[in-house]
Amino acid sequence: MSSAGDSGPGYVLNDFDAVPRGTRGRRPGLVKDSLLDLVKVQKGSYNSFTPNNESNERLEAIFHTIFPISDPLHRATIEFLNCRVDDLKYSESECIKRGITFSAQVIASIRLVIMQDGVSLEKYQEIKEYDDHSKLATVIKSAEEQEVRFCELPMMTDKGTFIINGVEKVIVSQMHRSPGVFFDSDKGKTYNSGKLIYSARVIPYRGSWLDIEFDVKDHLYFRIDRKRKLPISVLLKALGLSNNDILNKFMKNRVYKHKSGWKVPFFPDKFKGVRLPFDLKNVEGNVLLKANVRITSKLAKNLYDNGLKEYLIPYDSICGLFLAEDLIDSASSTKILSAGESIKLEDIKKLELLSIDKISVLNIDNVSVGPYILNTLFLDENMSYENALYEIYKVLRPGEVPVLKIVEEFFRNLFFSPEYYDLSNIGRLKLNSCLGLNYEENLTTLTHEDIIEIIRKIVLLRDGQGSVDDDIDHLANRRVRSVGEFIENQFRTGLLKLGRAVVDSMSTSSLDKVSPSDFINPKVLTNVLRDFFNSSQLSQFMDQTNPLSEITHKRRLSALGPGGLTRERAGFEVRDVHPTHYGRICPIETPEQNIAYNSLAIYARINKYGFIESPYRKVVNKVVTDQIEYLSAIDEGLYYIADTSAKLDENNCFVDDMLYCRYAGTFVMVNSNQVSYIDLSPKQVISVAASLIPFLENDDANRALMGSNMQRQAVPLLKPTAPLVATGMESFVASGSGAVVLAKRGGIVDSSDSNSIVIRAFDKGGINYLDVDIYHLRKFQRSNHNTCINQKPLVHVGDCVKEGDVIADGPAINNGELALGQNLLVAFMSWQGYNFEDSIIISSEVVKKDLFTSIHIEEFECVVHDTPLGSEKITRAIPGVNEENLYHLDDSGIVKVGTRVGPGYILVGKVTPRHSLSLPPETKLLMTIFGEKSFDCVDSSLYTSPDIEGIVIDVQVFTRRGEEENERAFLIKQKEANDFEKERDHIINVINQYFYDELRKILINSGSQDRESINFIEREGWWDIGLKNQSISKQVESLKKDFDEKVSHAITNFKRKVEKLHEGYDLPQGVSMSVKVFIAVKHSLQPGDKMAGRHGNKGVISRVVPVEDMPYLEDGTPIDIILNPLGVPSRMNVGQMLETHVGWACKKLGEKVGNILDEINKIKRAFCEAIRSLSDDDFEKFAALYLDNKKFEDINDDEITASILDTPNKDELNNELTTLVENYFNSCKDAHSSLRHFLIEVYSCGSNLSICNNIRDINDNHLIEFAYKLRDGIPVTAPVFEGPKDEQIVKLFELAGLDNSGQVVLYDGCSGEKFDRKVTVGYMYMLKLHHLVDGKIHARSVGPYSLVTQQPLGGKSHFGGQRFGEMECWALQAYGAAYTLQEMLTVKSDDINGRVKIYESVIKGDSNFECGIPESFNVMIKELRSLCFNVDLNAK
């Protein structure tokens, strides 16, 4: 962003508030910002479901599946017309504050049509279909249209989250098996023989699963919904196929003819390698080949070419064959043999007697074709169509009496009814692709042909034809269900429930004087949606620790949830990396446990079918184009894809003729002419969190996993600082996370303060005024994880902003870049044993500067209930509490904002009425004597917990509608109303300023008024002047109309906000008031806190060492943090060393820039001193020439130095003054040139051509301004997989004047002596994680006990004790500490009588105690008795 008046060459560098980063990457970036919409997976899916301005097809399609609804007697029907989503009533911030759901009402227009008596519903539908209005009137008794509220639909926020009951939640996308058919085998693991058992499974999107499988005997079975298996012939006969049909569909036939013997066609291909057990004779009976001679393919071809078309076959070779169709005697029309029946010798003779000269047999050779279908058919060859249906019904509905009509309808609904079965369009596509079918995509049910083709394919697999290539972990077989699909399914489920409720209501209601809304209960659908958002495993409490954790949570993929896996079944295969994950799912950011979570890769997107796609650049004739295409895992396997390491010339052509490419899941070397695509970017493989780790390629994958996970645990700091060594993704993460404020439209900043930013918005051309945009900043708000959300403005009044610019930073954001930690001076060395085992030593200076101080917001709530004895009351008059403990409460009894509170402070004073019978006698006596009423109630105030110490930053008071507000609630509302009023006035002022300026220009340009006279006229009168002038009246009238509309809109918005403010709150039943108190707790760094780097290098602070005791450099600079060098080689995360080196160089380069700036400042100070020491005459000459004749006392040093823009004119100044100015000018010019040259040399170490050009072009003033931003270090980027090589790092060291080893001499801060050898020192980016010692340390003396075992509870949340476990007992046994062990296992654990006695002993001052029987022993005895073992403990 730039100032409104900026111009000249300085604009480019000053277009950022953050310092431009010099990239140390090996190639310039090629990725467009539009590809980095990091929450598109959430917003895109939800927006495709919810209605928008263009269409609402998906929502209306769900309504059309339920409607029309008719009553059982067909007296009336309810028809759906259209639907819409109403406007939002409350904003996101109001919903969070009120604790309600951010939702909008779904309103549908429906029509209730009541039929005339005796008119059937079918007749009405028929007339309606033909659109015959004249006949419709004769069949309709009445028809009423009405808009009906159906439900409250939770709406997605701009950040891709939902606000449910005031809490931000995320719907995690789910990976599950794609609908379709999958073939598999057991890989020979089921049986010891190693025989392959093949199976097929049809998985629908909605409906029953169909499994088809072989058994060990090669019989083919099927299952429905994993119930008991049945022979496949039962399913086929239920489809209406006969035995003949079954055999003809799945088996080929051979025809045997009888004429002077049985003849068979001769096919050469079938005889390759065959030995016939009989002599091969032609039809004339000539022997062509003796028995048992092996027939080669050449011999078979020669026989065929020599005229052998048919050959004679002996009787014994026909015996045992199976008929392919029924044999019917044509004379008597009787069945001789049935299809599938085996032919015997007597059958052949019988056929000859009946003069049957042709038979068709099944072509089964038990080698290439097996008798699987035939054998399965023999299991139930006499089963009929009806019996087959009954068998299936009995398996799925055991115990119910089958009725044919019901059974037929039931079987049809299983697979062939769209109402109960849905393959989805992707399921149909996969079925078509796998089975070679050509059905339309919108046919989403199974067909008979589908089932037949599935059976045919599994039989071919068993015959050895084809292979099982369905890898269930292949991303072609796994799809993603996102939030829009989940809500669509829930909406459909809720509407089905609603439809059933409507039918029940219509059947029991009289249809006289009813309207459509009488039958629609909106709670039914609302409850279904509410249950999903509240209780679904995929509706999760958003991880809001920092912006990165938010964005990672939204991009997470889960295999758990409804329709997915369970934690127990999420094995290694599910979590393992698959070749198809490349560019789609991150191989690094995977779960460390069996929780089956993954993260989307950076540039991955999800297509309309739910498959993950990755972008690639198109390659045409060896030329890499800028055309970007997305490929799914299915498409990717068809092309040769090169990676980004392929060398390109200046024309983007491949340099090498042979390239390594990915193809079908493997790496192959191919000619560059065959390459179709190339990777878009090296980092497209990894996720957002992993892309923030510099030098990731130098880290072990396990440590990189820890690094990406720990960045999500980093606590936002009070003073966030962007990393010196970044990866270039920080700004994308910041802007995509929703933590920053982005400009919705371009414009000019009208005002900017800590609470809001006001921008006058213009169109994209910057010409036409649109409106006033007000951005309210979030100030010290509590996140889901109690971290602090605080936004700070980046823009100033008069700045020009563009659409999408970052105008305010958020938590853990610094100048629009993600800033999770601090850059610290680190030394890798051991120091007095305090950094043993990854422990970390921190300088006290780090704590003193609050570098790692974080603010956490704790929320406390006090609820006022209605009790049987009366309502509780918030008051300052609390019985039994001294006045000195109430000084921080206001008159209403609520703590004041800004109060510093500690453990045990009263936050809200509250008393609860109690019955007088419960008062002790002495209290009743005091009440009688003194007339005290305070004894009628008990103190139930809200106190701070023991571990809280901070400042009250906000108080919110919620009063139920209709209840009387207390004074504090009134003051809070009054303050908010005043804020709304100020906002309204500010908007109107901005509108007035713009429109009156425009009107002024029109009047002056038209000649109606001149510049002087118009100032003496009231502004409101300008409109009349313009309207009276006919030449500009239309223009003024249009301007006046826009002005009135915008002012009216601002006033209307103000009134609406005030009305909502005074309407009260919806509180739970029995609650009249609720008070929330927010306390800001400051956590400084202390021993026990966990810290980490970005490379998986983590540790706990062991000691905060005084700065004077820390090791220091030769120039006296103390080290900030000491890490153990042994933590590097064993963890193999060398990236942290490279980051340390580059950070060290960046810091030293910044110091060099600072030295040059100091030299320039020194020159300027000397010149200013010389000017101020001039004589009066000389100063007057100088002031006349350079300072506009200003007086000596009216100028400052900056004005003096800024005035010298060129060498002086010798004629106007004396020689001494001319020499002084010339020397200053030349000295500054040389210093500026030196600075410019140095910066160009620094930035030329990478792909920074644009920055180098800008440095050359900008003027000296902008150069100095730019250089001042680099004094603390020159920030650089090391893109993932494209980090700087060793030569570049060495060059940086040379520029910075550092030793190439990266090691320096250190001195001991305690003794001042030099350490024995040089130490690796540099700057590393360190994070403070949310594992704070304040949340871990816990102590207990007495507390709650378990009811069963009477042992102390465990954990800080239960105020539990420290468990003395099994291994601790072994330790005491090893030392022979019998009495200590007895004490631990009895009186200090669960010996009830013993711990009472030891308490009494302590009171009496007696050190003796007795141990009894622990309660756990009694529990064991009772458990044994439950197993019928009577165990008694008898004393001797």
UniProtKB/Swiss-Prot annotation:
One of its GO terms (biological process) is DNA-templated transcription. Its EC number is 2.7.7.6. GO terms for molecular function: DNA binding; DNA-directed RNA polymerase activity; ribonucleoside binding. GO terms for cellular component: DNA-directed RNA polymerase complex. It comes from the Bacteria. Keywords: DNA-directed RNA polymerase, Nucleotidyltransferase, Transcription, Transferase. It catalyses: RNA(n) + a ribonucleoside 5'-triphosphate = RNA(n+1) + diphosphate. It is an enzyme of class 2 (transferase). DNA-dependent RNA polymerase catalyzes the transcription of DNA into RNA using the four ribonucleoside triphosphates as substrates. Belongs to the RNA polymerase beta chain family. NCBIfam families: PRK00405.1 (NF001616), rpoB (TIGR02013). The RNAP catalytic core consists of 2 alpha, 1 beta, 1 beta' and 1 omega subunit. When a sigma factor is associated with the core the holoenzyme is formed, which can initiate transcription. This is DNA-directed RNA polymerase subunit beta. The gene is rpoB.
